[in-house]
Amino acid sequence: MLKKDVQSPFFYFLSVIEISTFVKNIRMMRTLNDFNFEGKKALIRVDFNVPLNDAFEVTDATRILAAKPSIIKVLEDGGSVVLMSHLGRPKGREDQFSLRHIVDKVQEIIGVQVLFVDDCIGEKAVEASKKLEPGQVLLLENLRFYAEEEKGDEGFAKQLSNLGDIYVNDAFGTAHRAHASTTIVAKFFPDHKCFGLLLYREIESINKVLNDSEKPVTAILGGAKVSSKIGVLENILDRVDHIIIGGGMTFTFVKALGGQIGNSLVEEDKLDLALTILEKAKAKNVQIHLPVDAIVADAFSNDANTKELPTDQIPAGWMGLDTGSKTAELFADVISKSKTILWNGPLGVFELEKFSNGTIQLGNAIAEATSNGAFSLVGGGDSVAAVKQFGFEDKVSYVSTGGGAMLEMLEGKSLPGIEAILN
């Protein structure tokens, strides 16, 4: 039930609008903290899609740790918790994707016994849910063992809704999917649905960059292709002061400007688009910073011959695989003067040690700016992996748990899982 001393107005005006519009009203959003769960059962959609090794042991528990605060809040209120999640992409019921493999890890992290039921709907699930006492946690079997989950089936969602009194969405990683457990189920909790603490913080962090940022704002966009970042580039031009371009897409811009890029990655059909983006940025007084030099190699290998060359003077037979030393200095200077920083995508092929220095130097610059008071948000699978690999996880303000979901928010798109709570 809602706490009587907390005012939590509903979003009565939402249908299909951009994320960038409604997150401006972030302080009106109902979260877990707006409810008292005493004697109540919280049905929480979490994202426990974690990596497992060959022995079915969790190798990265970040997503489980991220969900802990929401679970503990319910338990401390005197409520019980029913957790639902997916794991991998099973085709039907496959043991390797069973969530029973992660029960011990969830139990270890939360600090209380975690019960498990080998189904997520039906008599077994209902009975297990009914037997829950205050302070207990139940983990349901993999939602994707049923095709109805990804189809957004209403009947399946209705069965899920029978397992709890209050619906909580705390799975940012799947918020961009209109699945039964992330979107459809919310309709069965018209007055008893809210955001989990993790999902709220994700929205809050992105909002801080897009709509409530302290200037100057710098966005760092890396990755292989311009085509994968068009939406982001278009949406943030009105919101940032600087855009740093890195990764493979650098060379599409460089070639569009007439540079010689050798065998570097390029999207030939996006050269005009690259020029258009540069023109739009100039018209909006947004400075785009391209790498001025690169570590080039004669093969895509740690054993390749390498040298440092200007990005527009790469000869045939050589390819740019990382940013150079002058670029590191230029980018660090821009970042040091920034008050808000968004990092989405690495600058080079950091997975190969020989081409990781540009990404490491970028991480150092962001970490230093953060220690000096800047707000820094890191998101996107590869950049998050880089942050973890090089030890920057605790040196930035926030590391997002959602790759595709964050990208769609940065593009200004509405996310079904978020709209379902707001509507």
Spans of features found by a protein language model:
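Short, Lys/Arg-enriched N-terminal segments with co-localized hydrophobic residues
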Residues: 11-28
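Active-site loop-to-helix "anion-binding N-cap" substructures in soluble metabolic enzymes
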Residues: 26-423
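Positively charged N-terminal leader segments that act as targeting/secretion signals
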Residues: 1-11
